[in-house]
Regions:
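N-terminal signal peptide c-region/cleavage motif recognized by signal peptidases
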Residues: 18-20
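Short sequence/structural segments immediately N-terminal
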Residues: 28-30, 79
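Periplasmic c-type cytochrome electron-transfer domains
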Residues: 60, 90-105
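The canonical Cys-X-X-Cys-His
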Residues: 32-39, 101
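Bacterial N-terminal signal peptides
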Residues: 8-16
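Axial heme c-ligation environment in periplasmic c-type cytochrome domains
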Residues: 44-55, 68-97
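Bacterial N-terminal signal peptides that target proteins for export
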Residues: 1-9
């Protein structure tokens, strides 16, 4: 009985996570992020899985990435982007949405 309950709970959690990931991707699309990024592959900017891997375990990464998305910049991914800058997304994208997007990327 416990194993069955655990399996049901795990399946429900997976559905919630995939639903959240879908909502996060929709927010990324609406915000214009997918013009330069994708989860798996470099487009203009780095793949988000590569960003997550680079900053894994870095306690200050979230705040730095939020600032990078807000203000834009260049230099961190020059080898990948060929020097193409990250454009600023604030105030066009709300601060709370930028934070959600950064959480999504770092959680990959």
């Amino acid at each position: 009985m416990k194993a069955k309950l655990f399996a049901i709970s795990a399946a429900a959690a997976a559905l919630l996570i995939s639903g959240q990931a879908s909502a996060d991707l929709e927010l990324a699309k609406k915000s214009g992020c997918l013009a330069c990024h994708s989860v798996e592959k470099k487009v203009v900017g780095p793949a988000w899985k590569d960003v997550a891997a680079k900053y894994k375990g870095d306690a200050g990464a979230k705040e730095r990435l939020i600032e990078k998305v807000k203000k834009g910049g260049k230099g961190n991914w020059t080898a990948v982007t060929g020097g193409a800058p990250m454009p600023p997304y604030s105030p066009r994208v709300k601060d709370e949405d930028i934070a959600k997007l950064v959480d999504f990327v770092l959680g990959l």
